[in-house]
């Protein structure tokens, strides 16, 4: 189903072009037309950036698209103090040694949004299910690149990974 949706989006993108496609996606999401000539809302500005800036800033977008590689960029810019503590980076979930992790942490797929697992207490966690789910997500992301979504406008050069970070709580 996921791959099928991506193929349909890609066909539509090729048929009507990037700018019209993005306007259609905006209309679908926000139920109104975007003002790309004079963007005022944050969402309009993001869509404007998708249309115009990614052609000129592709190397930077590539770097910042991945949750792990963006960390190096932030360090180079002197922003390391804003980064969450990183416990590990893994090519697949089978590499994770849960015994070496703190009691609470968050696992994230580096080239996605919403594919995160919050572990508040590892003593009550089902590690087999966690590994199975993470590997499924990685497979979907890495194989889905062949049928990448035109919403992104490019395919990240490297495979997605899993990162494990300190779990931060609101006060």
PLM feature spans:
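Membrane-proximal basic amphipathic "stem/tether" segments
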Residues: 1-58
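Active-site nucleotide/adenylate-binding loops and adjacent lid/helix of ATP-dependent enzymes
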Residues: 53-54, 63-170
């Amino acid at each position: 189903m996921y791959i099928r949706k991506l193929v349909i989006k890609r066909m539509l993108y090729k048929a009507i072009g990037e700018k019209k496609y993005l306007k259609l996606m905006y209309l679908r999401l926000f139920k109104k037309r975007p003002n790309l000539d004079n963007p005022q809302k944050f969402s309009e500005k993001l869509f404007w950036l998708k249309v115009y800036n990614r052609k000129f800033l592709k190397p930077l977008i590539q770097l910042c698209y991945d949750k792990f590689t963006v960390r190096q960029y932030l360090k180079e810019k002197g922003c390391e103090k804003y980064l969450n503590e990183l416990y590990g980076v893994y090519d697949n979930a089978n590499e994770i040694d849960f015994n070496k992790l703190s009691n609470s942490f968050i696992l994230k797929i580096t080239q996605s949004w919403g594919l995160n697992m919050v572990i508040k207490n590892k003593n009550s966690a089902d590690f087999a299910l966690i590994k199975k789910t993470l590997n499924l997500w990685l497979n979907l992301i890495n194989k889905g690149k062949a049928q990448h979504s035109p919403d992104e406008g490019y395919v990240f050069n490297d495979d997605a990974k899993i990162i494990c970070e300190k779990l931060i709580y609101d006060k």
